[in-house]
Design a protein with these regions (language model features):
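Glycine-focused motif/segment detector
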Residues: 1-160
């Protein structure tokens, strides 16, 4: 939410007392963000994938049929369609801090953000439309694919 507010030059007002209040405030910032972003032309140029993500990118595409969200345009469109804040992660994807993709599971769309700390890949976020919680089975499916990729990297003694 911070990056969205920063991008639209909005001062955050953290005057809520309940989880419901936080969700309502998040959604109002998100709506304002989408409205302002829609008014500017989005860059469709795909970001160059950082080396540390390349092997996993191939594995995920071939195994799970994912759609990488690797441009400002794709991230914003995903956020608008899914009604969540993935559009605010443009900088994080561009710099390689995050690897974000969309995936369909049981005919429902989900958005997943992966991050890496000390060569360990983590599922940082995995949400459906309107920030609905993803099924445990999808977490397991993605996690198993990541684990297979990491085991291969360790076996080859390749450092990411």
């Amino acid at each position: 939410m911070y990056e969205m507010a920063y991008d639209i030059k909005k001062k955050l007002d953290v005057n809520f007392k309940t989880l419901n209040g936080l969700i309502k405030y998040h959604n109002s910032v998100l709506e304002e963000y989408h409205t302002k972003i829609l008014s500017k032309k989005l860059d469709k140029t795909e970001y160059k994938l950082k080396e540390k993500w390349k092997e996993l990118d191939d594995k995920l595409k071939n195994t799970l049929k994912i759609n990488p969200l690797n441009s400002e345009y794709k991230l914003q469109k995903e956020g608008m369609y899914m009604k969540h804040c993935v559009g605010g992660y443009t900088k994080s994807v561009k710099t390689g801090k995050s690897y974000i993709f969309s995936i369909y599971y049981e005919d429902k769309p989900y958005t997943c953000e992966l991050t890496m700390k000390k060569d360990i890949i983590n599922i940082n976020q995995l949400y459906g439309r309107f920030n609905t919680i993803a099924p445990d089975a999808l977490y397991k499916l993605i996690g198993d694919t990541i684990k297979q990729s990491q085991e291969r990297i360790m076996k080859d003694e390749t450092i990411i």
